[in-house]
Amino acid sequence: MKKGLLIILGISASITLSAQVPKIAGVKKVDLTNSNAKSTDGESRNFYNTATSNQRNAGPNAIQTAGVKFTSSWNAFGLLVSSSHCLTADQALNAVMFTHRISQDWPADANVASGYGEYSWSTNYGTTWDSSYFADQTSLGNKRFRYPSGAIINPAGNTNVANALNVATGPYTSGTNWDGYFGNYQMMVNGAGSSTSIFDNGVGTPALAFPRISITSYDDSSAWVSGGFYTDPIAATGYLGSNLMKGKWDGTALTWSFDSILPNFHQDATGANDSWTQSFVGFSPNGQIGYQVFFGVDGSATTSQTRAFSPITYKSTNGGATWNLLPVNDFSTIPAISTYLIPASDGNLKPWFDQSQGADIVVDNNGELHIVCTISSGYSDDNDSLGYTYTLTGQNGTTAQHYIYDVHTSPTGWDAWLIDSLMTTTSTNNTIFVDGSTGGAFATDARIQMSHTTDRSKLFFAWVDSDPLALAGENALPDLKAVGFDLVTGFKTPVTQFTTSQDFYFHYVSNVTLVSGNTYSIGVTNSIDRNGSHDVITTFDHYFYEGCKFNTSDFTVQFVGVNEQAANFGSLNIYPNPAKDQINLNVNMVSGENVSFQITNSLGQVVLVENRSLVNGNNNVQLNTSKLTSGVYFVTIASETSKVTSKIVIQ
């Protein structure tokens, strides 16, 4: 495996890279089709009749440095889409689960073939694993099931994996076309009651293809996944919008239902929609407040700034029964975004929301939507050139190539936080991977993903980046990075680099973070080919990396945007800090309001609450802290219109 110059920036250390003025190398039309992730992989074989013992069970030639090997897949095609939730977790079960193409190491079974799927799970955070297969290719008409992703439906109050349900969806192929899709469910421990529903395109089913984005389960025993609505779903061409697939468990059976959303996309001169060909769906924990997000140009946008690839967002407040389109928004008015944009050819700023480095969404503890992705600069307002962005060249590897954002809704409108910047771009010329089915190189990107605690009060963002001084600034030597945001306290962790091995390939991040005391464990997998050829059509081994963890004490940086709801608080001063028996708060109010003062400890537990009626102008408030033990606390001051949080230390 090739290694370049290694710059060790430090494990568990904040990484700050200064972005210089970017050099513009030109413009490009972005590939919106995700075409490299639609290989039909027409092969179908019983690998116990064809594979040698060495292919199945011997020590691999290519070994992943970070993590412990726990399973494998027939090839890498099930790993290609980072927005598929292939890795998930459940707090009540203390379980992590990986959904994938069936393992090359499955015990000898005359029926098992390469088109099967597999659930692999652990209840001790990767120490031991169990698994069961699903989507029986042989008994279901030799359909080749592809791109599986999955979720755990766990009934309320249950802590026994025997009573939990696995659920998965994906497309299937005959080897030439995409002929339909499937939905599977079965009991978690032993695969009991396994049921796979087959939906053939053109036979009384929606024009759906590739139900593989955002699959997540919710407290109402439902699971949602987003697929595409196509004029020709068999060829996966003519993208029109989304087709949502919902599975609902009633305690004895799971029923699938469908809905579609077809936005009014702007069209270019060829009649093609200006949009990415995958969308995202997510709900609040109770399954009631939901969002469907497309990246594209809204046909009703009228200004240069809004005629850009932006979130086209639909919201539901009744569990997906109905959806309402949010108004067109000008994201160039958000300073965190506009600061790093390059003016388009007409002089306007055109924020261009990009999926090429990965993207994800989460609905937080307040029912607000969070979108993570990179944002580029749109180049033109010409009707046929809205899909063009600037191409930047790194200045000896020192220029940030892509800026990562959390763009979110709030009670006062849209806002954004700058998460970090990528110092490398997609690896195309220097990737180690090849696609034997096409004979070409296989590119690798940052695979940006999001994880959240069960209550959605903490969000974690993870991606890979490489040494910017090696291999022409391409992301060919990836290491894992992550950062956490506490939405209650308004503090985040430093961006932390967790690995230095430069080989963290094809990673998946669990969409659910497991919490134990003060520790937040984010499950991550990474994968490498077994035989050392780096061909994505060969067997890939999967490794579980358990080292991506944060502690409550890591949330030390107050992040930009915490004062986004603080419009009525003209100023705030808290003293002394550190304090002992009392803290004094000087609050300057723009207008009089009833205000709540709340102190929480480092575990998020409320230890003091007082309500006061404050007047316009300066207000002095004293809070008795004499009964608080020594440590770090957070003071949240909230009114009906404003909210602000500050950190204090009690001695």
Task: Cite the ranges covered by each PLM segment.
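Extracellular, repeat-based ectodomains that mediate carbohydrate processing or recognition
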Residues: 20-559
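C-terminal outer-membrane/trafficking sorting elements
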Residues: 3-6, 15-18, 564-651
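Short, intrinsically disordered low-complexity segments
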Residues: 1-2, 22, 100, 611
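Repetitive helical segments and hydrophobic/amphipathic motifs
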Residues: 11-12
